[in-house]
UniProtKB/Swiss-Prot annotation:
Gene this protein is translated from: dcd
UniProt record similarity statement: Belongs to the dCTP deaminase family.
Catalytic activity: dCTP + H2O + H(+) = dUTP + NH4(+)
Transmembrane segments: none
GO process annotations (BP): dUMP biosynthetic process; dUTP biosynthetic process; nucleobase-containing small molecule interconversion
Keyword line: Hydrolase, Nucleotide metabolism, Nucleotide-binding
Location of the region described as Disordered in the Swiss-Prot/TrEMBL record: 173-194
NCBIfam families in the record: dCTP_deam
Enzyme class: hydrolase
Protein name in UniProt: dCTP deaminase
Keyword set includes Hydrolase: yes
Taxonomic source organism: Actinobacillus succinogenes (strain ATCC 55618 / DSM 22257 / CCUG 43843 / 130Z)
Amino acid sequence: MRLCDTDIEKHLDEGIITISPRPDNGKINGATIDLRLGNSFRVFREHSAPYIDVSGPKEAVAEQLERVMSDEIIVADNEAFFLHPGVLALATTLESVKLPADIIGWLDGRSSLARLGLMVHVTAHRIDPGWEGKIVLEFYNSGKLPLALRPNMIIGALSFEVLSGPAARPYNSRQDAKYKNQQSAVASRINQDR
């Protein structure tokens, strides 16, 4: 069952779901809460590798990932990050989110931004039960013009669904959780898959 606006408020008020900084209640819609864009970005360095062998030896994959991903780019609140057509970039939400073991989150992009060609997540829109940290966004500009994205703009909407019971293996308790407590645009850690 998805939480409605009054249940989202109640879960925030009671500390069952934590979002920091907490958006004001005006950012809570019928079944979602708006999240804003943070300051942390990463991009792919062009022509730094002919390909990424995502199923190759872990050490080789780690080396390729290090070569192709930029260092963290911090964009000031009053500046813009330009996402050009056909480019994939990573960014974070401004807010940090903490979910209990019996609630899963779903991040959706905004229709108004999608109509300009912006995809907020390429495939990863599930926020696991037990998650804690900022949400990394996988931006892709499928439009024809560069898009200027500014920190603090509303970038997506998060909804919450109550599970049939608490997860036995919530994200924050797993030893293999690769993105636990992430606070920046963390690059892929596919080389850490088991």
